[in-house]
From Swiss-Prot:
It is a multi-pass membrane protein. It comes from Mus musculus (Mouse). This is Reticulon-2. It comes from the Eukaryota. The chain crosses the membrane at residues 295-315, 390-410. Residues 1-137, 153-181, 205-234 are annotated as: Disordered.
């Protein structure tokens, strides 16, 4: 047997009477019974008798709410042609036929989504035995196509229902059902659109490890959330944010690692910068005074005697504080704790990572220094070697005038004064520095022009010098 469809809803509402449900003994003598049903299409008497004998059996079976369609008969004619009763034998051929009204009934019945045949194996009204969360992605796309077909069939059914000329007496309830079904289909259309958008969002995802897009079947929880309607946009935003964070996680870890290294390297430099810029006046003043006193002592005494005296001074200060705390404890005015306990509790050990970083830094500095010395003294570049020779020649005159400690003292004074002066007079200093660099570039160009083998470099140097002067 074919598919079973519920029709004739008006038969359930109206009571079964002799006029609506004819007796089996009366046969087809009553012309008023189902007058509209047998005038939809023209069929021959043989087709009508054959259809009636195969499908109906007796006219009393019209009172049932379900009609069984045979697969052979259903494929041969329309659905509404089966429900007609045979015409009475006494009807003349010349009698005019009523206008075809059953077509409007059939179309209105087809317009109801619960009564229309679906091209898919199951009807739309039937509950889905498998939850959408457990379906694969292809089955969800098939469901979207089915919803689109239902919307199109509902729209065609509404057009045919409005175009019918002679409605039945209980066509108004069918129209209400059709309108309700139309609202349901509109809701399902919006649901299908939102589901399509969520599938497009969730399907092309990036792999956190490789960063390439991969096809991904939505998880059950995501599929269940996608069926709740367009109000799940915050969920999509959360999912997108989650995957965005997963994509940035390796980069973030790398940045954190590099940040740790930079902090480990820049922390001493920041302390030195604070001292040189006199951010804390007391600390910078104390450091500057201590350095100048030590250097001045080294001018008159040997380095060994200066180091020994400084060490004794420090020990006298610390021992005096320690004895003072013990005396306070003896007279019951203190707890006798070490005044330097906070410094003693400081962890000065280096972790394995810090040790490796320090060793790598020291090794890199040693290797770079050795490479530079080899470059200068083994004359890898003649110009660079000549520059170094000129620098040492100038230092011979400086050494004849100044002592080494004097140069160190001048350097310390410059370190604690030049940064402040440069901050206050930055524009003027930059202007004078630019003039000096231009003069030096001209001098270098002249020297390179006179040295054999380096004449080709002179035009480029002169061009760069002219550009700098123009600026």
């Amino acid at each position: 047997m074919g598919q079973v469809l519920p029709v004739f809803a008006h038969c359930k509402e109206a009571p079964s009477t002799a006029s609506s449900t004819p007796d089996s003994t009366e046969g087809g003598n009553d012309d008023s019974d189902f007058r509209e049903l047998h005038t939809a299409r023209e069929f021959s008497e043989d087709e009508e008798e054959e259809t009636t004998s195969q499908d109906w059996g007796t006219p009393r079976e019209l009172t049932f709410s379900y009609i069984a369609f045979d697969g052979v008969v259903g494929s041969g004619g329309r659905r509404d042609s089966v429900v007609r009763r045979p015409r009475p034998q006494g009807r003349s051929v010349s009698e005019p036929r009523d206008p075809p009204q059953q077509s409007g009934l059939g179309d209105s019945l087809e317009s109801i989504p619960s009564l229309s045949q679906s091209p898919e194996p199951g009807r739309r009204g039937d509950p889905d035995p498998v939850p959408p969360a457990e379906r694969p992605l292809e089955e969800l796309r098939l469901r979207l196509d089915q919803l689109g077909w239902v919307v199109r069939s509902a729209g065609s059914g509404e057009d045919s229902a409005t175009s019918s000329s002679t409605p039945l007496e209980n066509e108004e309830p069918d129209g209400l059902e059709a309108s309700e079904a139309g609202e349901e289909t509109n809701l399902e259309l919006r649901l299908a659109q939102s589901l399509h958008l969520q599938l497009e969002v969730l399907t092309p995802q990036l792999s956190p490890s490789s960063g390439t897009p991969q096809a991904h079947t939505p998880s059950p929880q995501r599929s269940q959330d996608s069926n709740s309607g367009p109000d799940d946009e915050p969920l999509l935003n959360v999912v997108e944010e989650h995957w965005r964070l997963l994509e940035q996680e390796p980069i973030t870890a790398q940045c954190l690692d590099s940040t740790d290294q930079s902090e480990f390297m820049l922390e001493p430099l920041l302390l030195v910068a604070d001292l040189l810029y006199w951010k804390d006046t007391r600390t910078s003043g104390a450091v500057f005074t201590g350095l100048m006193a030590s250097l001045l002592c080294l001018l008159h005494f040997s380095i060994v005697s200066v180091a020994a005296h400084l060490a004794l001074l420090g020990l006298c200060a610390t021992i005096s504080l320690r004895v003072y705390r013990k005396v306070l404890q003896a007279v019951h005015r203190g707890d006798g704790t070490n005044p330097f306990q906070a410094y003693l509790d400081m962890d000065l050990t280096l972790t394995r990572e810090q040790t490796e970083r320090l060793s790598q830094q020291i090794a890199s500095h040693v290797v770079s220094t050795a490479t530079q010395l080899r470059h200068f003294f083994l004359v890898e570049d003649l110009v660079d070697s000549l520059k170094l020779a000129l620098l040492f020649y100038i230092l011979t005159f400086v050494g004849a005038i100044f002592n080494g400690l004097t140069l160190v003292i001048l350097g310390v004074v410059a370190l604690f004064t030049v940064p402040l002066l440069y901050r206050q007079h930055q524009a003027q200093i930059d202007q004078y520095v630019g003039l000096v660099t231009n003069q030096l570039s001209h001098i270098k160009a002249k020297i390179r022009a006179k040295i054999p083998g380096t004449g080709t470099l002179a035009p480029t140097a002169s061009v760069s010098g002219s550009k700098a002067k123009a600026e």
